[in-house]
């Protein structure tokens, strides 16, 4: 599959493994942006040229270079060091921040998946799978969940009243029928006796 790919279309065709990484080592600011930002430096104390650097890319290049000097092979994977304890929680909550211990834990979970509901409940963030399995999908409340529709309560109340009224009417008709049958039986028995 890799042999069929045309690597010349990649942005950095010398290193296809660095696809979609910024290859910015010294990107000069344009002269219009530089002149616009000169007003920020009072008294004319401003740097002659300003450079942008991709620090992640630069750090990787430096670690690979130091490993070459020390005699380590490039084939060994370069593992980033763990972040310092003083790292802010904002950075740790950033979705682009990847902690190696979390990634290793995820890989460990993938190697040994949970096949029972109890194991899934123990290891999962969503711990109520067994409760969801007990619910009946034929029940309307299963599909509605906690959704609220304005006016739905009043419609339900009207429907309940209508059902109750119809039940009472049926009971009244049955009682009337039973009473009329009893009256006819009593009258017929008195006439023929």
Curated annotation (Swiss-Prot):
Expression tissues: Widely expressed in the cortex and Purkinje cells of cerebellum. Expressed in the inner ear, mainly in the hair cells, spiral ganglia, the spiral limbus, and the stria vascularis.
Record-level GO cellular component terms: endoplasmic reticulum; endoplasmic reticulum membrane; lysosomal membrane; stereocilium
Transmembrane domains' residue ranges: 172-192
Recorded superkingdom: Eukaryota
A Pfam family this chain is assigned to: MINAR1_C
Location(s), subcellular: Lysosome membrane; Endoplasmic reticulum membrane
Major place of residence: membrane
Transferase in keyword set: no
Gene deletion effect: In an experimental Parkinson's disease model, homozygous knockout mice lacking Minar2 display severe motor deficits such as rigidity and bradykinesia, gait abnormalities, reduced spontaneous locomotor and exploratory behavior. Homozygous knockout mice lacking Minar2 present with rapidly progressive sensorineural hearing loss (HL) associated with a reduction in outer hair cell stereocilia in the shortest row and degeneration of hair cells at a later age.
Gene Ontology terms describing biological process: angiogenesis; apoptotic process; cholesterol homeostasis; exploration behavior; gene expression; homeostasis of number of cells within a tissue; inner ear auditory receptor cell differentiation; inner ear receptor cell differentiation
Statement: the UniProt record of this protein carries the keyword Membrane: yes
Glycosylation sites: 128
Gene Ontology molecular functions: cholesterol binding
Coiled coil: none
Membrane topology of this protein: Single-pass membrane protein
Alphabetically ordered keywords of this record: Endoplasmic reticulum, Glycoprotein, Lysosome, Membrane, Phosphoprotein, Transmembrane, Transmembrane helix
Known partners and oligomeric status: Interacts with NOTCH2.
PANTHER family per UniProt: MAJOR INTRINSICALLY DISORDERED NOTCH2-BINDING RECEPTOR 1 MINAR1 FAMILY MEMBER (PTHR31530), MAJOR INTRINSICALLY DISORDERED NOTCH2-BINDING RECEPTOR 1-LIKE (PTHR31530:SF4)
Similarity field: Belongs to the MINAR family.
Physiological role: Binds cholesterol and may regulate the distribution and homeostasis of cholesterol in hair cells. May play a role in angiogenesis.
Protein name: Major intrinsically disordered NOTCH2-binding receptor 1-like homolog
